[in-house]
């Protein structure tokens, strides 16, 4: 089970809801993924305009926990304002803190992220900050009281996969809260690797919404994350420099 704050989830896949070809495809992909946590950008949602269509109308919200994010924020203060807006909607008490420090790379601003997380924790939010693969920053965020840390595998939407598995492994080793790999996942192999490293979950969006067949890719990601977690729990064999026969010669009869 994936435990975030007071909540428990069977699925370790967190799915973004943006950039799908249509609301119908989005709905099918969400269902195929088996995800129980759905994230969305508050600034792109018409949560206070019921006359305008949005993905919430397509879903049975009793099956999902919503994770609004503060995408578009450049400062801690902006992130806090967006989070308060999401909370005022009555849909959720979790927030993914996203404070971007560079428009070209969409990498997070570490100083503003830390500041926003602290402010939101003081207001009683369940805080999940998007961060880089900076090992020290991840530790600072968990020490602050964040309910999970979400290090990026590579830049948002780049599909480059896990660029620095060593840093991610360091973050996971020191973690006292769930580690959810976020951003840059391109295909099922990337998701498997994240889980084999020991991550507690994976958040992805473009890898599914941008696929030629989003519904099939959503199912593939579901299976990849399950396989990666099983592999991690099973314990892979150590790598060796030389071969080791699976059928040793000892005890074999001479023909």
From Swiss-Prot:
Disulfide feature: none
Catalysis performed (reactions): [ThiS sulfur-carrier protein]-C-terminal-Gly-aminoethanethioate + 2-iminoacetate + 1-deoxy-D-xylulose 5-phosphate = [ThiS sulfur-carrier protein]-C-terminal Gly-Gly + 2-[(2R,5Z)-2-carboxy-4-methylthiazol-5(2H)-ylidene]ethyl phosphate + 2 H2O + H(+)
Keywords, in A-Z order: Cytoplasm, Schiff base, Thiamine biosynthesis, Transferase
GO cellular component, one term: cytoplasm
Chain segments annotated as coiled-coil in the UniProt record: none
Enzyme Commission number(s) from the entry: 2.8.1.10
Binding site for 1-deoxy-D-xylulose 5-phosphate: 157, 183-184, 205-206
Superkingdom classification of source: Bacteria
Principal subcellular localisation of the protein: cytoplasm
Cellular location(s): Cytoplasm
Gene Ontology molecular-function annotations: thiazole synthase activity
Pathway: Cofactor biosynthesis; thiamine diphosphate biosynthesis
GO BP: any one term: thiamine diphosphate biosynthetic process
SUPFAM superfamilies the record matches: ThiG-like
EC main group: transferase
Annotated catalytic residues: 96 (schiff-base intermediate with dxp)
Secretion signal span: none
Known partners and oligomeric status: Homotetramer. Forms heterodimers with either ThiH or ThiS.
Entry's family note: Belongs to the ThiG family.
Function: Catalyzes the rearrangement of 1-deoxy-D-xylulose 5-phosphate (DXP) to produce the thiazole phosphate moiety of thiamine. Sulfur is provided by the thiocarboxylate moiety of the carrier protein ThiS. In vitro, sulfur can be provided by H(2)S.
Protein's name in the database: Thiazole synthase
UniProt organism field: Geobacillus thermodenitrificans (strain NG80-2)
